[in-house]
Amino acid sequence: MTLASRRRRGRVGRPPGPAPDPEQRRQELLEAALRAIRRVGPNASMEDIAGEAGLTKPILYANFGDKAGLAAAIAERYLGDLLPAVLSAFETDADPRTMVRGAIDTFIGFVEGDPKVYRFLVRGVGGADMSFIEQRLIGEFGLRIAQVLRTGLRAAGVDTGPAELWSFAILGTVLSGAEWWIVRPTMSRADLVDYLTAFVWGGLTAGGVATLSPRPAFGGQDADATTGN
C-alpha cells in the first residue's frame, strides 16, 4: 500500500478509535503535572511534567503555552474549590474574629495538605514580567477578600479606600507565615493559625472593621471596587 493510499484511508498519524476529547486530555495533563510537582517539588520543569505524562514537551506547550500558562490552569482548578471554602468562613453566625480564624485555617489546611503544589503556585511561576499580585491564585483571593473588608468598613461608617491594600497585605502575611511554617514547622497548625489570626485581626480592628461578609453591601455590584471609596 502506498503512502498516498494510506492517507486516503486516514491511517497516517492517528491511533485507532475515536479522537480523544480535548478537555479530558487537558485534565489528564494537569493530573500528570500535579504528580510531577508532588514528586519533584515546586521547581518541577516542563521536562519533568512531560516525562510524568509520557509525552514530549511540545505537546505540553501546545496545551498550555508555557509554564506560566500551566500554573494558571492549576490555579484555576484549585480556586474552584479553595476560594469558596475560604469565603464560606464569612457566611457563618460566628463573631468576626472567629470568621477570620476560620478563613485562615482553611487556607493553611490547603498548604498543609499539598505544600509542594502550594509553593509551585506562589513562587513566581507567572514569569519575570508578572508581579506577585498578578498571579492567578493571589490576585483572585486578594480581590475577593477586599470585597469582604470593604463591606465591613462601610458597615462601620469609615473610609473603605484601604480595603484592597489591606487585603493584599493580609494575604502577604498569611502566605509568608505559611511559607515559614513549611520550612520551619516549629509549632502546630492550630498555634500557627492562632498567631496569624491575632496579628490580622488586631490590624483590622485598629482600622475600624466592625463586621465581615463575603457579599457586597448594596445588591450584587460592589461600586467601591471601581471608585475606590
Where is each model-derived feature located?
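Short secondary-structure transition hinges
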Residues: 102, 109-147, 157-158, 183
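Alpha-helical DNA-contacting segments of helix-turn-helix folds
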Residues: 37, 64, 71-78, 121, ...
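Helix-turn-helix
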Residues: 28, 39-69, 73
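N-terminal intrinsically disordered/low-complexity leader segments
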Residues: 1-24, 157-158, 208-229
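Secondary-structure edge/capping motif, primarily at the C-terminal ends of alpha-helices
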Residues: 86-93, 121-125, 177-185
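Generic hydrophobic, amphipathic alpha-helix propensity
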Residues: 24-33, 49, 74-78, 82, ...
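Amphipathic alpha-helical packing segments from all-alpha helical-bundle domains
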Residues: 129-154, 164-176, 191-194, 198-202
